[in-house]
Amino acid sequence: MFESLRVPVIAAPMAGGPSTPELVTSVVRAGGFGFLAGGYLTAATLADQIHKTRELAGESFGVNLFVPGVRSLVDVTSYADRLRGEADRYGVAPGAGRWDDDGYAAKLDLVVERRVPVVSFTFGTPLVADIERLHEAGVTVVVTVTTPDEAREAATAGADVLCVQGFEAGGHRAVFTDDASSDSGGPLLGLLSALRLIGAETDLPLVAAGGLVHGADVAATLSAGAVAAQLGTAFLRADEAGTNGTYRAALDAGGRQTAITRAFSGRPARGLENRFLRENSAAAPAAYPQLNNITKPVRAAATAAGDPEAVSLWAGQTYPLTESGPAERIVARLAEQAREAVSAAARRFG
């Protein structure tokens, strides 16, 4: 599947708005591949996006789903109380700290029914029975992993491809189990190290993800054993991305460091530092998606007000190097940069 791409670049699934059928289509037209983000969407909305993407891009697309985790028993009441002042600032109340499975079963049924060409999973490995259902429908199954242990689990369950995520990545870390004793939720492996270590454990094709915004980055991951590179942050400012105006303005302005935090969702995720992140990270428990539901009204109100200080501004470490413009142009530039990087490296070795 990914080995045959004319340009080995994949538009990563970015839940919450940035991933759109138009973004996927633009990347596909440039020779790459694109994912829709099923996370946080209803099955009906996802069905509409699948239909539209198929009309525009044919079969060169996939859908990403979040694997439901074990229900956390952590009491999130005190965290909700802590945020009342922040919520008052925007004239809203904190949301209910409920657990849910993001409509996983309905969305899994949908991608099987629609025979989506590729389905990727984040936050764990789906049940073997679910993978078998997908295979029976002709679906290629991708599991996102961060460590060799996770890679072995995914391979044993029947995954066809592993998406290897380095700690440089923007958005949620894909760790299978969120280790509450660690601010990062688990071991922090850089992308190239993770590719080498996981590549030594399996013969499955590897897709590289994590802080990739330049063609030289893409070339480096291919040299480290990946068959393609998956980029999210690089496309956040693309014309076709659904990145909201407040989010775009913060990316355009630059000047902020990135940090990993549980403050917004209860799961470790990398984003631009802002007031909410600084003031609440230390107090945020490992309770996903309860915290995501608690903070949702605050994030929505801050976004509507154009205030980036209480919005989850997910982005990888290298976000200052991103550019705006059509996604096709971004992919073409990545390809040219990769070719130049390979040629320059070859010259260094005579």
What are these regions (language model features)?
Residues 1-201, 334:
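Active-site entrance/lid segments in N-terminal catalytic domains of soluble metabolic enzymes
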Residues 169-207, 212-350:
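Conserved active-site-proximal phosphate/metal-binding subdomains
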